[in-house]
Structures are given as C-alpha cells and as structure tokens.
A protein has these predicted regions:
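Compact, Lys/Arg-rich rRNA/RNP-binding cores from ribosome-related proteins
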Residues: 72
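OB-fold ssDNA-binding interfaces and closely related basic DNA-contact patches used
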Residues: 1-63, 104, 113-115
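Short, charged beta-turn/beta-strand-edge "cap" motif at the junction between a beta-strand
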Residues: 87, 95-115
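Short nucleic-acid-contacting surface segments enriched for D/E, G, S/T with interspersed K/R
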Residues: 30, 75-96
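A short macromolecule-binding patch
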Residues: 64-69
C-alpha cells in the first residue's frame, strides 16, 4: 500500500481504521447524501487479483467510514483538494456523493462541494 495524500495529523491507528477496518462501507451506500468529512486518505493498493487500484477512504464527523475506487469520484475529490491547497485555503468539510450514467448506461459516483 502506498499513501498518495491524507489529512494532516492522521495517526497510524487512523490509517489502519480507514484502510483495513471492518466497518468501512462502500461510498455507493452514501449516494445522494451530504457527508461532513473530517479525515481522508487516498492510496494505491491491489485488488484480490493483484491488479493496482487507487482507493479513497473518508471518515465523517459522526464516525462513519466510506471507501471507493470510483475513478470519477476520486478524481473529483482530488481536484477539490488540489485547488484548495493551491489557494492556501482550508478544505471544505461537506461533500455531496452524487451519481451519473455513462454512455454505456453504467452508473458512476461523483463528488462535489456541498453548500
């Protein structure tokens, strides 16, 4: 496992809970919801077949943990983090878990800043 980016101050216990914890749910379970995120980690790992994948795991202010390997959601979230870092601004805490349909009618997850 290789950590790409994470919330400042994340402890080893936090990293374990977000990347290996049994209570981490699928981000798709939060589709349509606004999540108030207090911790995140973006990391590279391998799937069960040994193929590389990038995973985003988050923890909300009420302790719920979600993870996804959705390329669109991860790209959206990473772009938000990069833009706010470049502007030396604090990262927003509220994010909308949205969805869309591809041309081949497959559903995918999206991430946006909640107002």
């Amino acid at each position: 496992m290789e950590i790409i980016k994470k919330t400042d101050g994340l402890t080893s216990a936090d990293l374990y809970a977000l990347t290996k914890g049994n209570d981490v749910r699928k981000m798709a379970d939060a589709k349509g919801e606004v999540l108030e995120i207090k911790k995140f980690v973006l990391y590279n790992d391998e799937d069960v077949n040994g193929n590389p994948m990038t995973v985003l795991a988050v923890e909300t202010v009420n302790g719920a943990k979600y993870a996804t390997n959705s390329k669109t959601f991860t790209r959206n979230f990473s772009d938000i983090v990069s833009i706010y870092e470049a502007g030396n601004e604090a990262l927003p805490s509220r994010f909308i878990v949205g969805s869309g349909k591809s041309k081949s009618n497959r559903e995918y997850l999206t991430c946006d800043i909640a107002s």
